[in-house]
Amino acid sequence: EVIPIYITKDREWYTGECLKDIEIYKDMALLKRNAKNVVLYYRKGEFVLQSKGLLRRVVNTIDIAFPIVHGTNVEDGVLQGYLQSIGIPFVGSDVYASVVGQDKVFMKEIFECENLPIVNYTWFFDHEYLEDPEKEIKRILKKLELPVIVKPAKLGSSVGISVAHTEEELKEAIDNAITYDEKILVEELVKNLVEVNISTLGNHENFELSEIEEVMSAEDFLTYQEKYLGNGKKGGTITSSKGSKNARSSHKIPASIDDKLKEEVRRVASMA
């Protein structure tokens, strides 16, 4: 039996059959009226979902958690740490892997230690920049060549990311990024970029690699709008590599890269 649980942006947990209807997520007030506001805890050998409020009662019990989640506090190790502290089994990455997977700086530092190829980068905390913006700008430009791409280190979905071709644009990009995160990553922009994705499933002893996906973008990077809105529509499109040249697709599966490059992508993914 699948028991749906929804975590709101204000960190409240809800459960109920109504959550199986995707339309209900368009109206949060309706969702909250129809679902049960609950907390998860361990009681007498069971993991229970108990209702909040005056009349507290056990709404359901669960055996294992499937964190099918996206965003801050749920895919960055916070939720995984909570589940682990309670003791409930859960699928997917553990706390450490979730943290490293979400923090771009941590990930790059680990890749560097393993001699994996990465783009030239630097990073800083917002207070370091705010204390002396000119000094930090000079440090960045001494280490990296323009154009650069500025990213909040711990966010996803391309939120807060900007490309800077000039020093003035770099300042604007940083000012934008620090409104989203206190930790900022700056990388040299890869020119004539062909962006590909590959997934691994399993662990270091036994894993499988996915097909390689090519990301199609009209910008210097795949933007939030392209990822989720797609030419004014909800989401981009996916086509095969044999699709029409005129198709305005966001992704191409499999990627249209040569066999040698495909093997290199698989090799690096396996090492990572």
Model-identified regions with their sequence ranges:
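Aromatic/hydrophobic pocket-lining residues that form π-stacking "cages" and hydrophobic walls in ligand
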Residues: 79, 173, 269
